[in-house]
């Protein structure tokens, strides 16, 4: 089943970064104020959807942006803000910790964050979360479609092998019992 991160989290990350810019990068006090007021305002706006997702049996609510930032901090500084920066690492850690270890990190147009941040933190994510299965794929005019599809198939093959390993002890217990 495909799990797609929440689009509003991208905007929340942009707002969240403003306090760091004020504290560490010399941006004016209005940047910090926009973060301190903007994040709670966005949370209030999202509250009905989050409550509905909490009540659902099939969907999970999005993680609070400050929690996503905490998940990213072992990998990158919040000061890493170009492109998606720290947020890309935080999103991948969020997916893994919430039970989605198989990730296809897709970036269009040879996007610099995927090359620098995405591919750079994938090794450390795999180290910290041993069951994770992550592949980074670029979709741009120069990319080979066959290569893209083969990388996705390889990721799915690894996911199926990992699932079989997880189910093997359960099947063994059922056969013994």
Kindly label every feature range from the protein language model.
Residues 1-177:
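An N-terminal assembly and electron-transfer interface module characteristic of large anaerobic redox
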């Amino acid at each position: 089943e495909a799990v797609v991160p929440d689009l509003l989290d991208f905007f929340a990350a942009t707002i969240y970064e403003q306090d760091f810019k004020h504290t560490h990068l010399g941006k004016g006090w209005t940047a910090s104020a926009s973060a301190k007021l903007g994040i709670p305002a966005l949370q209030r706006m999202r509250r009905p959807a989050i409550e509905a997702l909490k009540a659902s049996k099939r969907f999970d609510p999005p993680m609070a942006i400050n929690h996503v930032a905490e998940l990213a901090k072992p990998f990158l500084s919040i000061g890493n803000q170009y492109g998606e920066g720290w947020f890309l690492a935080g999103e991948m850690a969020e997916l893994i910790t919430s039970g989605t270890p198989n990730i296809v990190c897709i970036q269009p147009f040879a996007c610099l964050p995927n090359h620098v941040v995405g591919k750079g933190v994938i090794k450390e994510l795999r180290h910290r979360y041993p069951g994770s299965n992550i592949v980074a794929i670029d979709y741009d005019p120069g990319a080979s479609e066959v290569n893209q599809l083969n990388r996705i198939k390889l990721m799915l093959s690894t996911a199926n092998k990992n699932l079989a390993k997880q189910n093997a002890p359960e099947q063994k217990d059922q056969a013994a019992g």
